[in-house]
């Protein structure tokens, strides 16, 4: 990529006000010089300037192009999504596995906008700390940890999508700099992200506000230490370093236990959060209630709930909008969005005949709704008013499901939540094998019990049977794969899961088996395409190849070259 080609984003927009957290004015910078004569050094004089640019990193992350690609790259090619209503051609082509370098979804420039803003903060913030006594060394370290985590998140999306990508931690601020860079291999980028986060992980803020503060939402809409730890756990999982993945998961789990205890001490009794074998989780049914939907309402309806670790923050009338959910999942005017769920995910679920979901699994009804001959995606599209009962479920009507759809494009987009930590740890334990199978099963079982509406009164009941799984690695892996699909349906993770397992397997066989389930036509052609291990990644955009002669196209899209899966 020619990073100089995205320099316009930092010069034209780096120091615009962010809407995710603080609202420091950016006028100081914008009024200094005409935009084509901007001198960045003239801006960096005080703590408020640093905060402005940090906020702009979050603002760039809210961008609709970034949000849409998080969904498209992480979900669209998986077995979770098919055509909905009025699907754009570029999306339809990806659904048909007709990937072309001219497809707009191959454009990664907005991710590099976020990266470049983060790099700029890392470059200039130390200079501000040296001249502004109000900007302390501890605050500087917290700032570097914050933007380093956001930068790592963006690079993580890029390598999971394209495999090898241009990588730099230097900002694009000087016309004399040469920013035509070749692609850095996946493993080298991954190692660098881990190394960088290891240096700053303990500098990140633990909490910005107490849990009972009106501003507590910032504890999960800004980078915290727990987000950095969770991202590190995920990075280590992809690296195959399972001990470290488990270590960082345990740190987050310990914090959540501490947070739960603090809430108990403060409030005396909680009717919506319960310990599931020692891990606090939001219940589907509050204690004493007969209706489900409580977990959805807190996690996806209202947002920034107890289990949230990091989510991209949107609020109505604040400039940024989650157009991915509004357009592709649905809205108050259109139940069916541009995308839909395949039949096998929802057919006969309430009758107890679905291959993935049990009849009482709340996650099915919170994510999918029958709409004429299609299955509408409703996760994120409903407000915090979902209510239904699964006690005597016989069919969809027997659920007596009540909900209200969003009128604004203000659904937060969840990047990590407590379920991620639980299932990252479970996957790492399965990969380690041996005695870890039992603990991995118990981790998965906790989420399954919650999803089936188990409350305190029946906490000892198991919804899964350990003897059915824990004596076989293959069965444990299949259980984990299915539970991740049930838990994270439409959250932008399924395709990345399939890619991770393909890299671990050294084969696309398992990926192809799952991803082809949604197709009814052309299945053999699609399987042949996916048998090429390079094809599981996206091609580089045609415009990037034109401006960067050092960038070489993925061999799956340059026919005739040897194919080899990088593990």
Q: What is the predicted function of each stretch?
A:
Residues 45-49, 54, 58, 65, ...:
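Elongated scaffold/linker segments in the mid-to-C-terminal portions of large proteins
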Residues 27-71:
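A short, exposed helix-loop element centered on a Lys and neighboring polar residues
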Residues 242, 435-437:
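TPR-repeat structural position
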């Amino acid at each position: 990529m020619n990073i100089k080609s995205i320099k316009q984003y930092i010069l034209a927009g780096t120091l615009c006000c962010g809407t995710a957290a603080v609202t420091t004015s950016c006028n100081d910078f914008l009024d200094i010089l005409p935009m084509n004569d901007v001198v960045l050094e003239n801006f960096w004089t005080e703590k408020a300037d640093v905060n402005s640019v940090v906020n702009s990193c979050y603002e760039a992350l809210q961008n609709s192009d970034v949000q849409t690609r998080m969904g498209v790259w992480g979900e669209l090619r998986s077995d979770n999504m098919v055509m909905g209503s009025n699907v754009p051609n570029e999306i339809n082509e990806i659904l048909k596995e007709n990937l072309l370098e001219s497809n707009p979804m191959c454009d990664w420039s907005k991710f590099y906008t976020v990266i470049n803003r983060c790099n700029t903060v890392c470059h200039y913030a130390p200079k501000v700390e040296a001249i502004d006594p109000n900007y302390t060394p501890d605050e500087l370290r917290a700032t570097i940890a914050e933007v380093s985590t956001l930068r790592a998140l963006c690079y993580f999306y890029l390598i999971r999508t394209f495999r090898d990508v241009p990588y730099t931690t230097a900002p694009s601020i000087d016309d004399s700099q040469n920013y035509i860079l070749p692609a850095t291999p996946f493993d080298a980028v991954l190692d660098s992200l881990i190394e960088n986060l290891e240096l700053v992980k303990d500098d990140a803020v633990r909490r910005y506000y107490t849990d009972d503060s009106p501003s507590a939402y910032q504890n999960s809409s800004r980078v915290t230490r727990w987000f950095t730890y969770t991202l590190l756990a995920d990075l280590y999982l992809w690296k195959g370093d399972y001990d470290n993945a488990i270590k960082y998961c345990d740190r987050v789990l310990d914090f959540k236990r501490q947070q739960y205890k603090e809430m108990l001490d403060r409030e005396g009794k909680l009717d919506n959060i319960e310990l599931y074998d020692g891990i606090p989780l939001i219940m589907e049914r509050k204690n004493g209630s007969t209706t489900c939907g409580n977990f959805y309402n807190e996690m996806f309806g209202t947002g920034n709930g107890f289990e949230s670790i990091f989510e991209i923050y949107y609020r109505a009338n604040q400039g940024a909008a989650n157009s991915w959910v509004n357009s592709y999942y649905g809205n108050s005017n259109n139940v069916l969005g541009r995308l839909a769920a395949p039949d096998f995910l929802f057919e006969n679920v309430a009758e107890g005949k679905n291959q993935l979901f049990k009849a009482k699994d709340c996650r099915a009804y919170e994510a999918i709704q029958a709409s004429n001959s299609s299955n509408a995606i409703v996760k994120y599209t409903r407000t915090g008013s979902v209510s239904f009962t699964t006690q005597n479920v016989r069919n969809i009507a027997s659920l007596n499901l009540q909900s209200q759809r969003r009128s604004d494009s203000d659904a937060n987009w969840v990047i990590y939540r407590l379920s991620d930590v639980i299932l990252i740890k479970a996957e790492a334990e399965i990969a380690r094998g041996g005695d870890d199978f039992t603990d991995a099963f118990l981790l998965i079982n906790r989420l399954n019990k919650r999803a089936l509406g188990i409350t305190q009164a029946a906490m000892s009941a198991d919804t899964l049977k350990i003897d059915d799984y824990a004596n076989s690695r293959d069965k444990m892996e299949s259980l984990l794969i299915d539970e991740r699909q049930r838990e994270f349906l439409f959250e932008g993770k399924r395709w990345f899961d399939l890619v991770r397992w393909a890299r671990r397997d050294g084969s696309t066989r398992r990926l192809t088996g799952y991803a082809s389930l949604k197709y009814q036509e052309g299945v053999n052609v699609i399987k042949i395409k996916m048998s090429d291990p390079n094809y599981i990644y996206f091609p580089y955009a045609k415009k990037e190849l034109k401006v960067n002669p050092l960038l070489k196209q993925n061999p799956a899209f340059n026919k005739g070259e040897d194919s080899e899966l990088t593990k």
